[in-house]
Amino acid sequence: MTNLLLYQRIAQQLAEDIRRGVYQPGERVPSVRKMSAQLNVSHATVLQAYANLEDQGLIRARPQSGYYVHQTPALTAPTPDIARVERPGLVTRASIIQQVLTEARRDGVFAFGAAVPHVDYLPVRALHQQLAKVTRFHSPRAFSYMFSPGFEPLRRQIAIRMRDAGVLVNPQEVIVTHGCVDALQMSLRVLTKPGDLIAAESPTYYGLLQLADLLGLKVIEIPSDPSTGISLEALQLAANQWSIKALVLTARLSNPLGGTIPEERQKQLLRLASDYDIQIVEDDIYGELMFEQGKTKALKAFDRLDRVIYCSSFSKTLSPGVRVGWMIAGRYQDEIQRLQTFTTHSACSVTQMAVAAYLENGGYDRHLRFIRQEYRKNLSAYQLAVQQHFPEGTQMTRPTGGFILWVSLPGRVNTQELHVRALEQGISIAPGLIFSNTEQFNHCIRLNCGIPWNKEAERAVITLGLLAQQLCREPAIPLL
């Protein structure tokens, strides 16, 4: 690729951002140095790109100040169609799930159970600095209500970041939420009513099962594979038998399998959803933790018919405590905003402003590179330890990102009993039982590898392995 083509590509991308309103008239675009570092290109290449944009009348240089947006052409935001839908299987695991979450927070417990990143992998100091600045310099606004759809500078930063997932959106299309589960629950509330059927991957995120139970929904579980994602064949069979109102899934780094749907199968999935008029709710909370960024796009990137409601959050990358997520609801935007206005309004004003400031300062990408490297090393270490210390016949997933590991033990091992015995040793795990409304994953566990690999972690894995070996030798224990 020549420099000429490269600078044209950079200019074209920035022009698109300006047309979509990511950068407003009179607003400064990234400096030459910042853009050069961000794209890993020379200063000369960026200067050529900016000169090209000046020729188009899109930006203008100000002496000793930088480049600013000069004019903004009309926004072009196509918003096509969508779907709807219904079927059986009530959710039951709520009390066990609550127990697992409570135990994972106890002092002195090694928390393999909850998928929460260790504090070493959170930019605590940087977030604290931004929170202090927000409360010091913007206190009247920071302590007022922030109504739906949320803090506009934050929505602009999210719109910029969505480009990495292959999704081009206007800031106006972004709705800030109280984390990803809040986005999921609002999606399901506008798509379904009590008694309706939704489809989900199996195994699936236990929070979705809790949410379905809360909303009075029935769940049909569609088998999923760590390498190829949800079974399209099984989904089609289900759609032929029942009226499915919505499909909730994760196309990139599913929880608990850590699987990613290849792009061709993502397109097939969208065609199938169109054929059967199924609305899709995409949970992309782990998407920014893929080890090879840009290799696989979000499902929303291929959504030409506005069939996907996209949901995500900063809980797995910045901090679970900030409770800032977002969604792109397409034709359901007005309905979602009305629902949000009369329930939660929007996420906390202070944290929205602090996260926006943190993203604007440019440290987020550096932070993501750091934690991706750490999680890749952690997963390798935990996988090796499980292989060495768990019973013969144990299998595990090979995630291409994130920090969760799905472990399948020999069939005799009841992991609910393993969970009980592990707690007696000060170790929390997530038994496979909670990831399904069936009992087919009773021999599986999910391990949180977002914990630094050290002697304590090694001892915890060895202890789990010994307990699993012990259960292998005992008569099978029936599930309660």
Please describe what each predicted stretch is:
Residues 283:
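Glycine-centered flexible beta-alpha turn that most often forms the glycine-rich phosphate-binding loop
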Residues 1-134, 337, 341-348, 359, ...:
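N-terminal basic, amphipathic alpha-helical segments
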Residues 369-394:
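Conserved PLP-dependent catalytic core of the aminotransferase class-I/II
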Residues 60-61, 169, 429:
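Short beta-strand "wing" residues that participate in macromolecule-binding interfaces
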Residues 127, 304-373:
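Conserved core segment of the aminotransferase class I/II
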